[in-house]
C-alpha cells in the first residue's frame, strides 16, 4: 500500500505542481499558506472517518466472523490473515494522515513567524511540495479505507447468510 497507485499518483501530481510552480513564479509564501490552510481544514475530517472505520471493524465485528478472517491467507506460516491486512491498511492510512496533519500544523506555525531568508523561495517550494504530496496521498488512501470497509461488510453479510443457510440445511436434513 505504501508503494500503491495512490503513492505514485501523489508523487506524479506533486512533480507536475512543482514544475508549474517553478515556471509561474507566483508568490510562493502565499501559496504555501493557502495550501497548508486547505490541508488543515479537510484532513481532520478524513482522519476522523478513518479512525471511525477502524473502530467499526475492530469493535463491532462478530467473533465467529473475526475468527474466520484471522486464518492465514497463504499456506506458509508467515502469511498474514485478511484481518491483519485489513487492520494494517487502516493503521498505515491513519499514521500517514496524522503525519500529514503534524507537518501542516508545523508549517502553519512557521508561516506565522514571517521569517525572511535568502533561501525563502527554496524553503517555500519545498514546504508546498511536501504539503501537497502528503495531503494528496492522505486523501487517496481514503479510497483503500472505503474499499476495506465495503469488503468487511460483504464478508459479514456472507458469513451471516452462510450461517442461516447452514441452519436451514440442518433443519431439512
Region locations from a protein language model:
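Long, highly hydrophobic alpha-helical transmembrane signal-anchor segments
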Residues: 2-42, 117-120
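Select subsegments of transmembrane alpha-helices in polytopic membrane proteins
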Residues: 5-13, 88-100
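Alpha-helical transmembrane segments
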Residues: 36-51, 133-135
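Membrane-water interface of transmembrane alpha-helices
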Residues: 53-69
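Short membrane-interface loop/juxtamembrane segments of multi-pass integral membrane proteins
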Residues: 70-89
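Alpha-helical transmembrane segments and their membrane-interface junctions
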Residues: 92-115
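Alpha-helical membrane-embedded segments
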Residues: 125-151
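Cytosolic/matrix-facing juxtamembrane and C-terminal tails of multi-pass cellular membrane proteins
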Residues: 148-173
Amino acid at each position: 500500500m505504501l508503494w500503491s497507485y495512490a503513492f505514485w499518483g501523489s508523487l506524479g501530481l506533486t512533480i507536475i505542481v512543482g514544475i508549474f510552480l517553478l515556471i509561474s513564479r507566483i508568490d510562493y509564501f502565499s501559496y504555501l499558506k493557502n495550501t497548508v490552510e486547505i490541508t488543515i481544514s479537510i484532513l481532520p475530517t478524513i482522519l476522523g472517518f478513518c479512525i471511525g472505520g477502524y473502530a467499526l471493524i475492530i469493535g463491532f465485528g462478530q467473533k465467529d466472523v473475526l475468527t474466520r478472517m484471522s486464518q492465514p491467507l497463504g499456506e506458509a506460516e508467515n502469511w498474514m490473515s485478511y484481518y491483519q491486512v485489513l487492520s494494517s491498511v487502516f493503521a498505515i492510512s491513519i499514521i500517514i494522515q496524522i503525519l500529514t496533519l503534524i507537518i501542516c500544523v508545523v508549517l502553519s506555525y512557521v508561516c506565522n513567524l514571517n521569517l525572511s531568508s535568502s533561501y525563502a523561495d527554496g524553503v517555500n517550494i519545498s514546504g508546498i511540495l511536501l504539503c501537497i504530496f502528503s495531503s494528496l496521498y492522505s486523501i487517496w488512501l481514503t479510497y483503500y479505507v472505503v474499499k476495506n470497509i465495503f469488503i468487511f461488510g460483504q464478508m459479514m453479510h456472507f458469513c451471516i447468510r452462510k450461517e442461516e443457510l447452514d441452519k436451514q440445511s440442518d433443519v431439512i436434513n
